[in-house]
């Protein structure tokens, strides 16, 4: 018989740097999860992506055991890294902070394809381009 799920916790944690301090500790403490067990396992699984923010979905069962799924980093984080900028534009329609080739947007779309709600790579690329536009990053051919 399958275990009963008691809670699903969604967090965004920096890869390889999960620790019991907020936001991880309080979120998992309320669910009754072994916080250090999660931190060690998460850091081990994400050590190759150090520095990126990784969304994680933790499924907590009634016996307080857990499993978790790591997702791809948010599109905004990948776009900022690709454009080599620290911060997006406060006024994306007026101030463009960077230019990014369409091929780079397509690479990001390919890496995020499993997490995007898109039928094909073209639709995924358009989603990434829309995110870039809202951040003040201009997509050029």
From Swiss-Prot:
Native source organism of the sequence: Selenomonas ruminantium
Protein name: Large ribosomal subunit protein uL11
Functional note: Forms part of the ribosomal stalk which helps the ribosome interact with GTP-bound translation factors.
Modifications the protein undergoes after translation, according to the UniProt entry: One or more lysine residues are methylated.
GO process annotations (BP): translation
Signal peptide segment: none
CDD domains from the UniProt entry: Ribosomal_L11
Family: Belongs to the universal ribosomal protein uL11 family.
